[in-house]
Swiss-Prot record:
Protein name, UniProt field: Transcriptional regulatory protein EDS1
UniProt superkingdom: Eukaryota
Organism of derivation: Saccharomyces cerevisiae (strain Lalvin EC1118 / Prise de mousse)
Database matches in Gene3D superfamilies: Zn(2)-C6 fungal-type DNA-binding domain
SUPFAM superfamilies: Zn2/Cys6 DNA-binding domain
Family annotation (Pfam families): Zn_clus (PF00172)
DNA-binding region: 56-85
Molecular functions per Gene Ontology: DNA binding; DNA-binding transcription factor activity, RNA polymerase II-specific; zinc ion binding
Keyword set, alphabetical order: DNA-binding, Metal-binding, Nucleus, Transcription, Transcription regulation, Zinc
PANTHER family: GLUCOSE TRANSPORT TRANSCRIPTION REGULATOR RGT1-RELATED, GLUCOSE TRANSPORT TRANSCRIPTION REGULATOR RGT1-RELATED-RELATED
Compartment(s) of residence: Nucleus
Amino acid sequence: MSHHVPNLYGTPIRDPHEHKRNSASMGEVNQSVSSRNCERGSEKGTKQRKKASRACDQCRRKRIKCRFDKHTGVCQGCLEVGEKCQFIRVPLKRGPAKKRASVASNEKFSSDNDPLQYRPRTHSYPMNSGNNYLPSLARNSSFPSISSLFVPSITAQSQQFVKVPYDDIKRRSSLATLGSDSSISTEFGGNYRLDENLNVRQEGKDIVAKGMITPVEEMGACSSNVRRQGSQSLPIQEQRASPYINPFISGRSRLSSLSYTSEATTSEGNTQGKNQCMLTPNSVRSIEKERLNSLTAGCPNKKLGTDGRSDKWDKNSTWKPVYRSSNPSHPSTEKNVSLNQEASAKPLMLGTYRQFDATSFYKVLGIYYNFFHINFPVIPINKSKFTDMLDPEKPNVIDEIRQINNEIIQCFKTALEVLVFCKIKQRRSSKSTKSWSRDSLCDFQKGLYYIQNFNKCIADCFQSLITIKPVLKQNSSVIPSRIKFIYFSTIIVLNFILILAGEESSLLLGPSVGVFNEFQAHKLFLPFENTSPMLLLNSNEESGDEILDYAVLFKRLYILLNILDTLQSFRLGQPKLINLNFGSAIETYFSDKTGHNQVVEKAPVALDNILRNLKLGEFITYFVLNRKSLQVNVPHHLLFTNQTDYGEFAVEKGEHDNIAGKFETLLKKKEILIRKLLNIEQKNDHILENCCNSDAEMKNIGELVCSMITLVSGILDSITNMNAENSVDLDSKPLPNAYFAQDSEEELMSPTQSITSNLASEENTRCTTKDLMGTVSIFMLPMVEECYNIISLIGPIPTTLISLYIRNGNMAKGINDRIMTLSTALNELVQITALFNTLEPFRKNAHDRAKRYYVSATSSTGCYESVMKSMYSGKCAASNASNVAPSEEENKKILKKFADIGWKLMDDSELGCCCCFFN
C-alpha cells in the first residue's frame, strides 16, 4: 500500500517506488495536472477537427450552407447580417454524437480527465475552508478559470454540444504553460498582463461570501500548482505596464466577470456560456489572435450596474475599447507611455491583423469632418490645424505632462468613435459595399459595442475627464493650450452625442457647464479678461510655422456649449444654464474674419452652411431667453403690450432657401400668429360681426397659417431629401482613399475643401441640398418635433375658415381666392403627413408622445387646457368687451377654438416642443 505525504500546498507527493507501476494509468489521481495535460495533448494531437460539427441556428433556419471562418469566429451568413453564430437548438436525434461510436473508451477517458470527479485527499493540517474555493488563476488573470477549460458531461443531450464550434477538449495547451508566466506575449506586440491590484486571498473570501462564484471543492487539489505559480509571478507583474485596462468595465465588474468562469461549469443547460469560455483549438498564439477579446469580455450572465444591453453584448463580444484611466484613488506604478506606444498597445481585433492605429483614427476623423462638421462644428477649427494638435511630439514636454496629454487625447478618440460609430447607417443588404461589415470587421464590431453600451461609454468617458480635471487645473500653466482645447472639445462632443440622440435629461450638460465655469471660460468675453490670469490660456503656441489664437478657440467652444444648452431648453422648456449675452458672436468669432489660420472650415461652401446653422442656434437662444413663462416678476399686462423685438434677426434675402432660414422664419411667424389669435379673444364680438365683410384680421390669419404650412412642407421635404434617418450614409458621400495617407496637407483635408477658384463668387458659396446629402444635423430632431406640434395645432384652421366662408354665403371678390389658398394648404397637409412617416427621429419618438400629456391640465371632457391660459386667467380681459353686442353661439365656439389654438401654440413655445399637448 503506497503512502502519500501531503506537501505544504495540499498536493500529495507520490512514492518514487511506484512510478513504474502507475506509469500506464493516464487518469491516476495522484498525477499532476501539467503532466496529465501534456500526455493527453500528445495522445490526441492527431485528431484535429477541420470545421464546425454542425451548422449554426441562423443558417439552419434559413436553410443555407454554414460557411464557418476560423479567423472571424462567425460564419459568412451571420457576418453579413451582423450577428453571432448561435448553437442553442436542441437536437432531436438520439444516440451518440459523430465520431463517438466507442462509448466505453470515451467514458473511460472522460472519467480520468474530468476534474469534477476527482476526489482530493484530506489535509493533515488545519486550513480555512474559504481558501479551498479560491481559483487564483481565474481571479487574477484574464484567462478563464480551470473549471471553464473542462466541460463536464452533465446530461446525455448536452454531451454532443461540447464540440461546437470547435473540439476544445482534445486540442488545448497545457495549463502549466499558461500559468507559468504572468504575461502572455503575442506576435503582434505587447503583453497581456495579469491583474496585480487584487488581494487574492481576501478578495476571494469576499466574493465567495457574497455568492458571486460557486465553490467547487473538487478543484482544490487540481489547481494547487497553478495557484502556486500565479502567486510566485506577482512581483514580476508589478513591474510591467498594463496597456489593456478596460475603461468600460469597472474594477468590481471586471472582477465578477473573471470569477464567473468557475460558476459556468456547474450550471446546467448553459451551453452557450460553455462555448464562450472554452479555449480555441490552436496554440497560445492562436488563442491571442482569435479569442483574446472574447475571453476578456467576461461571461454571458454577468450583472453590470448599467443598462441591460451590456449583458446582451457580452454574449457575442469580440471587441472592447481600451482606455487607461487615471483614477488617483488607485495608484499605479506604470511608466509613462508615449502616444504611439499607446496606439500600438491596443487589443487585437478579431479577424484582422491591422491594429487600430493612427491611420484608422484619421479615417474616423475624416468621417466627422465630412458628415458632422459641415452642419455643426463640434471641433471649431479646420481639419489640417486640428490634425497638427493631435501630434504628441509637438511641442516636446516632460514625461509626466506627456502622460496627461496622451490620456486626454485618448478620451477624445473614444468620444469621437462613439459619435461616428453610433451614427453609421448599417446596411442589411449584401449589395452595399460601404457597410462597416464589408469595410472592416473591426469597425463593425466597434459599432455594435458602442450601440449596445451607449450610455455606459458616455458615462465612463466623461468620468475619465472629470478624473483628469484636478491634474489639468493644477498644471494648467505647463500643459499646452492645444491639449486643453482637445479636453474641452471632448466635453462638447459628449454633450453633442446626447442631444443628437434625443436625450431628455441634462445630467451631463450641467457638470459640463460647471467645468467650463471652473476654468473661468466666461471671463474671456468680459472686458477685464486681461486684468486677471486665465487658466485656459498660456502664451500663444506655434502650430507649424503659424500662431493660433487660443482665446478665440476657447470662446468658440463656450459659444457651442451655449447653443447645446439652448437646444435642450428649447426642447424641454427648462431654464438655460448659460445666460450670458454674447451679442453677434457667430459673425465675430466663427467667420473667416478671425484669420486664415484658425478658420472653422476652409471651403467657402461648407463655411457658409456652418454659419447659417450657428446663426439659427443664436436666434433660438434669443427666442428662449424671451420666454414669458420664465419671467416671473413680469406684470400680466405685458403679455400683449410687450412684444418681442425680432428686428435684429430679420430674414435676409435668399436666407429662406435653406433649412435653417426656413425654420427661423417659421418660428417668427408662429409668434405673430400667437398674438393675432389671442387678440381675437379680447375683441371676439367685434370681429364676428364683420368677419366675412371687412375683417382684414381674419384674412391675415388665414394667409399666415397657409404660409406656415408651406414652410413646414418645405422643411420636411428638405430633411427627407438630405438625410431622413439623420445618420452617416457612406453610400451618398463615399470617403476617398486620402484618409489612409498622410503625405500632404491636401490629403488630410475633406473633399469639400478641394474646390476651384470659381466657387469664391457670391452665388456659388451657397450650400445646396446636394452638398448636404447624407450629413448629420443636430437641429433635425427639434425641427421635426416643432413642425409636428405646429401642424397638429394649426391644421384645423383652414377647414374651419373654409366652412365659415361657405356658410355665410358671401362669395364676394377675394373670398374665392382665400378658399383656393386654404384648399392648397389642405393638400400640403396630406403631403406633410406622409413626410412625417418617413422621418426616422419622429418615428423613434412617436411612441413616447402619449406619456407627455399633462394630466392635471385636462378638463372634465378630456380636452387639454392651456397651461399659459391658466397662468394669465382673468388677467387679459378686453377693456372694450362690454361695449360689444353678443354674437351668435356658433361663431363664439369658432372664436373660442381659435383662441385655444393660440394658447396652445404659446404652450409649445414656452414649455418646450418636446412636451406637447393636444386635444
